[in-house]
């Protein structure tokens, strides 16, 4: 069973991923009901689409899992989406799956491990790394997703 610090961290990650949290849009709330065509939209050619941000979030969760399990991970690449509905739905399922797998990886940690420095040259505890690459990162992108959706639909969601 996870200790209180690990449990609080998982609850925080769940809040930024699934909501509701009242402070900022959760990832799954921001993409609920979107089609592939809607997810592909971008406000200008040089900006990322909702699809690309969702793909980036799934890849970032994979990175976090690798860091927890192996102590190192490659930076996730940005990719161009295939664009079809089946691929979009598969990506949403993959995102949910990586969230579950990240939670499982975290549940195996002891609270004390969160206070260790896994990458000494970064001079940050595992807890700091997870908060910055996990929930803070998701809150940032949750805002982007909600904003992009609002731009596309001609309204803003809060």
List PLM regions with ranges.
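Acidic/histidine-rich alpha-helical segments that form the ligand environment
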Residues: 83-117, 128-137
